[in-house]
């Protein structure tokens, strides 16, 4: 009887140890309260990023009591003819938090503008995150006709709310 109890307890412990903490965190993160401001700072597309006096920033505020991160993507640049904009959240298998802004636009005008995107991440139970902002993968065709993929990001790094509850990242 004791042997079967120990075998049963061993099987349960093995099952519990095979489930990683990241899996439960991955399933629980969610996005809410996504909105955006109106267009500001209109400029011609022919101007360079250096001409834009309003640089993009990501501001994140951690609320431990509510287990939320309130975010603001400041000065997200897009076409003036956009019809909607927002941000998506993903979490990779390794726990990396990925925030990807998006917009719907026809891009038929010679005009760009900046908006602010506001969002809340719910069930943010950890104080440390590997954060990737605006990850996109493109296929590049080389001169010889071969193709390869490259992944670009606006930001990739580690953030910690352990000693501060507000983090601002210059992009």
Model-derived features: positions:
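Sec-dependent N-terminal signal peptides
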Residues: 6-11
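Exposed, flexible binding/inhibitory loops of compact, secreted disulfide-stabilized domains
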Residues: 20-171
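C-terminal motif of bacterial Sec signal peptides marking the signal peptidase cleavage site
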Residues: 15-18
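Positively charged n-region of N-terminal signal peptides that target proteins for export
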Residues: 1-4
């Amino acid at each position: 009887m004791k042997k079967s109890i120990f075998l049963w307890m061993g099987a349960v412990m093995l099952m519990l140890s095979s489930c990683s903490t990241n899996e439960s965190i991955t399933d629980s993160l969610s996005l809410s309260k996504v909105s955006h401001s109106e267009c500001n700072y209109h400029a011609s597309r022919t101007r360079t990023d250096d001409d834009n006096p309003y640089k993009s920033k990501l501001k994140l505020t951690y609320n431990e009591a509510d287990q939320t991160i309130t975010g603001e993507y400041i000065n997200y640049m897009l076409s003036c003819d956009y019809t909607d904009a927002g941000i998506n959240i993903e979490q990779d298998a390794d726990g990396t938090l990925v925030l990807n802004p998006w917009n719907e636009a026809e891009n038929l005008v010679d005009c760009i503008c900046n908006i602010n995107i506001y969002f809340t991440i719910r069930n943010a139970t950890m104080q440390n995150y590997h954060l990737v902002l605006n990850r996109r993968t493109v296929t590049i065709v080389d001169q010889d006709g071969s193709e390869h993929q490259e992944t670009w990001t606006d930001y990739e790094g580690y953030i910690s709310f352990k000693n501060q509850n507000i983090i601002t990242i210059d992009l």
